[in-house]
C-alpha cells in the first residue's frame, strides 16, 4: 500500500515494528491470512479472494465495525487504519514541500498545479461512484436471492400440506374398511377380529409420499415437527411410527466443513426459537399425556439427532420449574446420557403431577396370543401403572384381578374353578398358573383342529376339566319324523357341540336357557294352569279336574263380559249362515 520509493516517517516505522512484534507474540510468527480474508469478505463483498494492496479496497475495509469480525481481524484492521492515516499525512507533507520548492525557484505553473488537483479530485469522485454502484448491485442481488428462497419454501410447504391431507384421507379409508369388515363378522366368540395395521394398507402410498427435508429448507415442517438441514453433508434417514403409520424423517448430520479439503468436524447446532415453539405445541399435554411422553421425547431426539445439551434446552421449554428441579435431584442426572435424562424427566413428571385414573383402559386390556404369561403380565403392569393411579405396593389384588379377567373366557373359568384361592396369590404365584392353563387351552385347540370333522361330531363334548358336556341327538330316519317332531313337548338341541353362550330354548346367542326371556314370557302368558301341564289341571291333588266346556257360537265369542239389553236382543234374533244380525 503506498509509494515504496518514498521513505516512511518515523511514526509509521514505529507502528510497523509494533505490529510485527505483536504478530510474532500472538501467532508465533505466522498469520492466517486466509481466515482474515474470509472474515473481511463477509462484511465487504467486493474484497478479492486472495487479498489486495489497492488503496480503495483498504479504505473501505477499515470502515467495517470491529465488533462484527474476529479478534485477530480487528487487530489487523486497527493496524491498517493507523498505516493509512500515516500515509495520508506523509503525502500531504510531501506535496507541501514540493510547493514550497517551486515557489522558491519561481518555476511554479499555477495552471498546471490547478489542473493536477482537479484531475485527482475527478479520479477520487469516479472511484467513489464505482464503489457505490457495486454495493447497490450486490444489495439488490441479495434481496432477489432472499425473495426466491422464500417463494421456494412456501411452495414446498404447500406440497407437504397436500401430502399430509392425502395421508389423512387414506387413513380414514382404511379405518372405514376395517369397520365394515367387523360388521360382516358373525357374533360368535370362536371368531376373532383381526386387527389390521393401518400403516400396512398404506405402505406403498407412504413410501411414495414420505416427507423428506432438504438443505434448501431450514424451517421445513414434516408432520408437525420442524427439521434442521443447514450445512449438512450426507443425510441420514430414520423411520418413526406415528398414529399407526410409518413416517420417514431426514435429520442432519452435525458435521460442518473445516475449510481444509473434505475434512469435517462435529459442531453442536442448538434448537432455534421457532423449533422450540413448535415442539412445545406438539408435546403431549401434561399430566394426561405422561404415558406418551417418553415415546414422544425419544422420537424427537432421534429426528433432531440431539445430544444431552439439547435435552436440557428442550426441557426448559416444555417442563415447569418443579419438574426440572425434581429431575436434577436424581442421582447422576447431570452426567447421564440422552435416554437416561428422558427417563428422569418422566419420573419427575409422575412425582410432581397427581395420578390420572382411567379404568376403562384397564378393563379393555385383554390377552393377545401368542403371548406368554410373563409377557402378558409385563404388558399389563405397564397399562396398570399408567392408568390406575394407585401405588404399586398397595395394588396387588386389583392387578391380579385385571390379569385374570383379561385372559380368554375358558382359561379364566378353568383357573378360577381349579384354584378357589386365586385372588390371594401373589404375582410370582399366579404367573405359572396362567401359563399352565394357557398351555392346556392351546393343546386342546390344536387337537380339535387336527381331528377330522366326522370324528368331531362323533366325539362327546369335553371341557378343560375332563367332564363330558351336553351333546344333542341326531334326527332319526323314522317315517313321518317331521310330524312326530311337532308333537314333542319341547324342542331338542341341535346336533354337535353347541357354543356355551347359546340358549337351548330359543337358539339365540348371548344367554342360557335358565335366563331365556322367551321362556319367561311364555310361562307368564299361560297363567296359573295348575299341575296338569300345558292342558291345565287342578292346583292341588285334592281338587278334581274341571269339565271341558264346549265353545259358544262364533258371533258370541266377542262378548266375554256383562251383556246389556242390546246385546241380548241381537243374540236372540234368528239369522242364516252368511248373514249378520240386524
From Swiss-Prot:
Lipid-binding residues (covalent, N-myristoyl glycine): 2
Gene of this entry: gag
Residues annotated as site: Cleavage: 95-96, 251-252, 457-458
Biological function: Capsid protein p25 forms the spherical core of the virion that encapsulates the genomic RNA-nucleocapsid complex.
Keyword terms: Capsid protein, Coiled coil, Host cell membrane, Host membrane, Lipoprotein, Membrane, Metal-binding, Myristate, Viral nucleoprotein, Virion, Zinc, Zinc-finger
Natural source organism: Walleye dermal sarcoma virus (WDSV)
Zn finger residue spans: CCHC-type: 501-518
UniProt name for this protein: Gag polyprotein
GO cellular component: host cell plasma membrane; membrane; viral nucleocapsid
Biased composition (Basic and acidic residues): 168-178
Coiled-coil regions listed: 154-185
SUPFAM superfamilies assigned: Retrovirus zinc finger-like domains
